[in-house]
């Protein structure tokens, strides 16, 4: 409509060569980046395309490359986004998925690691979200060995007991109900 140029990033432009518990290394092949080695500092596969999109956006914003390609790639590697598929301790990943797409991406990420790791889910939700649908999606597409439900602070909480009841409808995994979020985290780490 406005005549703005579009710059697509396709998954085929990204060749993943190494995955770890903290990052995904890939080669980017588009624009100024021909076989450029990039590290997306996240466990989630969708962050490869997001990182590539950020680099391509920099090409559009800074076509003279006043910010060097090396600096751009280093900035991607050093990116921190708290609570978004963030590895906070070895084997402990925090994700604040808050909508249907976020849950879908969370599920894909869990599916990519559940063959290698025992999955213990620490879960809470806010009252205005469709948490039953979220729980159903998670339980129908992943295999957690245990679920710890807790409550966030504030007036938007869903009681932990209510969340436990919903989980019990969709999974046979062990369910632990702990309203105190700190105790819930500690409990999840011991399961």
Pin down the residues of each PLM region.
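Extended acidic/charged loop-beta regions that coordinate divalent cations
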Residues: 1-37
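General small-molecule cofactor/ligand-binding pocket signal
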Residues: 4-9, 86, 93, 176-178
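Short, surface-exposed acidic
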Residues: 7-10, 65-72, 174
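Short, acidic/turn-prone active-site loops that include or flank metal/cofactor-
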Residues: 11-14, 124, 151-155
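A polyampholytic, Gly/Pro-enriched intrinsically disordered region
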Residues: 28-38, 167-176
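Nucleotide phosphate-binding/pyrophosphate-handling subdomain across enzymes
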Residues: 30-146
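C-terminal helical cap/extension that packs against the catalytic core
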Residues: 92-93, 135-191
């Amino acid at each position: 409509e406005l005549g703005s140029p579009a710059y697509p990033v396709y998954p085929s432009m990204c060749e993943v060569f190494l995955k770890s518990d903290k990052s995904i290394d890939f080669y980017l092949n588009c624009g100024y980046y021909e076989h450029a080695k990039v590290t997306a500092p996240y466990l989630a596969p969708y962050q490869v395309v997001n990182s590539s999109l950020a680099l391509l956006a920099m090409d559009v914003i800074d076509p003279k490359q006043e910010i060097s390609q090396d600096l751009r790639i280093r900035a991607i590697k050093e990116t921190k986004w708290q609570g978004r598929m963030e590895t906070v301790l070895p084997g402990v990943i925090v994700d604040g998925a808050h909508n249907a797409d976020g849950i879908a991406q969370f599920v894909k990420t869990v599916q990519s690691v559940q063959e290698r790791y025992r999955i213990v889910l620490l879960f809470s939700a806010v009252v205005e979200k469709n948490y039953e649908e979220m729980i159903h999606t998670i339980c129908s597409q992943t295999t957690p060995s245990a679920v710890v439900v807790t409550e966030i602070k504030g007036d938007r909480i869903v009681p932990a007991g209510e969340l436990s009841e919903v989980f019990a409808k969709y999974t046979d995994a062990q369910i632990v109900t702990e309203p105190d979020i700190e105790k819930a985290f500690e409990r999840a780490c011991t399961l």
